[in-house]
């Protein structure tokens, strides 16, 4: 069965547009089978977009596990002078995110596979609704890889469902060298702020 974290989804394509009204304007996303959030904007993603603090106005920003691009597009709108890196292993997700950014005229979004970001890039902010279902070990490796690329004054905001391990992820991140606090909750989700 095809999973949203597969490189090449085997699910039959059936694009569907979703529309979400935000304080800074309407967000129109084309979604598809085999990509996280088919036919909707996930509740955790919504919470992160609505509750995360202001982003740096410039620099390099990362949407880790971009899916169709809800986070990346929101970041690009809020920080038009920044470069937003939208990263996903899933080819279909990258194609949708790039297309959605283009439809919104957001030219500061660079959609890439994980290994295509230059090594010297350091992130001033990371937003992620991480792929929890890849498994605990793989998730920890993923987070350590990318949080380790934060700029000295950078920070990450992660949204995780409580019943999928948010409350155990927080102390693990702190013990792994990334002091983490919970800054918001809602609809069974936690927003974690890591440094």
Give the predicted meaning of each segment:
Residues 43-128:
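Conserved SAM/SAH cofactor-binding pocket of Class I
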Residues 153-160:
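Conserved beta-strand signature within the Rossmann-like core of class I S-adenosyl-L-methionine
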Residues 140-152:
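A short glycine-rich, Lys/Arg-flanked "PGG" loop and its adjoining helix->strand segment in the class I
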Residues 30, 110-112, 181-183:
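General small-molecule cofactor/ligand-binding pocket signal
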Residues 2-14, 165-195:
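Class I S-adenosyl-L-methionine
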């Amino acid at each position: 069965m095809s999973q949203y974290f597969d490189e090449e989804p085997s699910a039959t394509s059936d694009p569907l547009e979703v529309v979400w009204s935000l304080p800074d304007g309407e967000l129109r996303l084309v979604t598809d089978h085999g990509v996280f959030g088919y036919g909707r904007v996930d509740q955790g993603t919504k919470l992160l977009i609505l509750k995360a603090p202001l982003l740096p106005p410039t620099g390099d920003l990362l949407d880790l596990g971009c899916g169709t691009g809800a986070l990346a597009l929101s970041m690009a709108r809020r920080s038009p002078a920044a470069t937003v890196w939208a990263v996903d292993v899933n080819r279909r997700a990258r194609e949708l995110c790039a297309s959605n950014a283009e439809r919104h005229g957001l030219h500061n979004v660079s959609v890439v596979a994980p290994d295509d970001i230059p090594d010297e890039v350091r992130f001033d902010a990371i937003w992620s609704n991480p792929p929890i279902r890849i498994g605990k070990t793989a998730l920890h490796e993923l987070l350590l890889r990318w949080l380790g690329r934060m700029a000295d004054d950078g920070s990450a905001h992660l949204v995780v469902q409580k019943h999928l391990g948010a409350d155990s992820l927080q102390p693990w991140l702190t013990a792994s060298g990334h002091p983490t606090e919970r800054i918001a909750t809602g609809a069974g989700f936690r927003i974690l702020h890591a440094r």
